[in-house]
């Protein structure tokens, strides 16, 4: 058990750094650091695209579970493990997703990296809106709903403020409007 102590100490420090970054990314206060700009630039390269689509989804579930949802490979972006119930299979399906914190919940963007179709997790949660989230202090059971068109503009602006690459995804998606999903915590 001693071998995990340094890692957990590191995870706590990392979680504090993530919280500080979250606070700095509050709308109207975003001043991207050189690191954030470099991460966004990298994510738009073929290597970054490969990393986001292939490698991070393999590493992040393990890392997020190990650290209680506090640490992912995509620092400084906040990442959760979203567990949905399969629309056809009825089996639990877990996906690492970036998210935004809003006043009374969390927002996830169903961009599917700009693909012409919605991601599988989006189809699952529209069929079964009760989901589980592993995201540090925000972990819990939530109910999902697709954001109304009236709310979408405000949340889309927040999403673009957090990660400018969503604009490119929207262009790649063509006629598909990228849905935004609001997760609201279920209180016992």
Q: Model-predicted segments: where are they?
A:
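Membrane-proximal basic amphipathic "stem/tether" segments
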Residues: 25-60
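Short beta-strand segments
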Residues: 77-113
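Extreme N-terminal basic, low-complexity initiation segments
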Residues: 1-8
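Short beta-strand micro-motifs in enzyme catalytic cores
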Residues: 80, 177-181
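Short, conserved active-site entrance elements at the starts or edges of catalytic domains
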Residues: 48-87, 91-92
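Short, structured beta-strand-loop surface elements
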Residues: 32, 112-166, 172-177, 185-187
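Cysteine-centered motifs
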Residues: 10-13
